[in-house]
């Protein structure tokens, strides 16, 4: 179990929650990290100070203690070299993640015994995704609702997050802040987004993955409607992390013009406990303008 000593930061959420936000500061090392127990990984938010080898050793200890499969960070190009020098591997990029700069995903994967895999993260082969006709007209019987209510969105994640392999990507809020609810008869569908107005990007998720052929059309149209909402919010770049073998979900993103920009080894854990690789699908939807400045400046 992770423990954080006084003066080194404290857990922001209880150890019973799937995702915990922690802060660590000691000497010249200062960073934040998200511990995701459900998917056995940890994301580092680095403040670019301190010795990288000491940081790596710190995360190696957490990985062994917590039984983690993976530690990763999302950084600009110049910082990726420092992480690579201490044993992290580049698994791909998120174009436009920092609005005017791309992000690089640097990862360290561990064995079942908690030892770093020698040679870096194993490479994944891309599955074949069929090309399909875009769904530009609303499918018959589908009604849509735009949802921003935080309590409703938290409930959607509680009810559907595990089955949808949902994994929060940002700090402080562990659910989408905007979503489209679709309904056909008695069936509900949800697609959501975690937005970042400072950098103009959003992570999008299907919180109810397709279960049958007709679901694909419904979810694609809903995703298209969500992209329209994000564009109206001046979002420039969107991305999604999709399990490697979720071919139907991948087909939706492919139809919407997304491209694979990263292949992530053992990035998620299925409900039965099996590790699964993932692909990061990306698309630019708007112009990359300068970051928004706070109103008090």
Give, region by region, the residue ranges found by the protein language model:
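Short amphipathic alpha-helix that is part of the acyltransferase structural core
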Residues: 2-14, 32, 37-48, 117-169, ...
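A conserved beta-strand-loop-helix scaffold within acyl/acetyltransferase catalytic domains
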Residues: 20-41, 158-212
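A short, internal acetyl-CoA/4′-phosphopantetheine-binding micro-motif in the GNAT/acyltransferase core
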Residues: 40-53, 111, 206-218, 242-243
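Conserved acetyl-CoA-binding loop-helix of GNAT-fold acetyltransferases
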Residues: 49-62, 214-231, 251, 255
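Conserved GNAT acetyl-CoA-binding A-motif
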Residues: 63-75, 231-243
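Conserved beta-strand-loop-alpha-helix junction that forms the acyl-donor binding cleft
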Residues: 72-80, 240-250, 267-271
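Conserved catalytic-core motifs of GNAT/GCN5-like acyltransferases
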Residues: 74, 89-105, 259-274
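Conserved active-site tyrosine of GNAT-family acetyltransferases
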Residues: 82-83, 252-254, 258
């Amino acid at each position: 179990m992770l423990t954080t000593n006084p003066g080194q930061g404290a857990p922001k959420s209880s150890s019973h929650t799937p995702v915990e936000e922690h802060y660590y500061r000691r000497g010249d090392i200062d960073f934040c990290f998200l511990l995701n127990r459900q998917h056995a990984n940890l994301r580092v938010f680095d403040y670019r100070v301190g010795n990288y080898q000491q940081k790596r050793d710190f995360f190696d200890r957490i990985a062994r203690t917590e039984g983690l499969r993976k530690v990763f960070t999302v950084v600009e190009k110049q910082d990726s070299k420092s992480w690579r020098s201490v044993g992290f591997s580049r698994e791909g990029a998120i174009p436009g993640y920092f609005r005017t700069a791309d992000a690089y995903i640097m990862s360290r994967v561990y064995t079942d015994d908690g030892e770093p895999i020698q040679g870096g993260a194993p490479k994944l082969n891309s599955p074949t995704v069929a090309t399909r006709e875009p769904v530009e007209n609303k499918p018959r019987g589908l009604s849509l609702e735009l949802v921003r209510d935080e309590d409703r969105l938290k409930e959607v994640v509680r009810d559907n997050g595990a089955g949808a392999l949902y994994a929060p990507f940002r700090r402080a809020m562990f659910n989408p802040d905007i979503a489209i609810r679709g309904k056909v008869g008695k069936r509900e569908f949800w697609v959501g987004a975690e937005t970042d107005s400072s950098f103009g990007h959003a992570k999008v998720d299907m919180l109810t993955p397709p279960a049958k052929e007709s679901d694909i059309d419904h979810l694609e149209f809903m995703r298209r409607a969500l992209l329209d909402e994000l564009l109206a919010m001046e979002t420039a770049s969107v991305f999604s992390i999709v399990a490697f073998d979720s071919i139907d979900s991948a087909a939706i993103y492919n139809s919407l013009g997304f491209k694979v920009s990263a292949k992530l080894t053992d990035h998620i854990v299925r409900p039965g406990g099996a590790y699964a690789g993932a692909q990061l699908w990306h698309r630019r939807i708007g112009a990359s303008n300068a970051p928004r400045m706070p109103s008090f400046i």
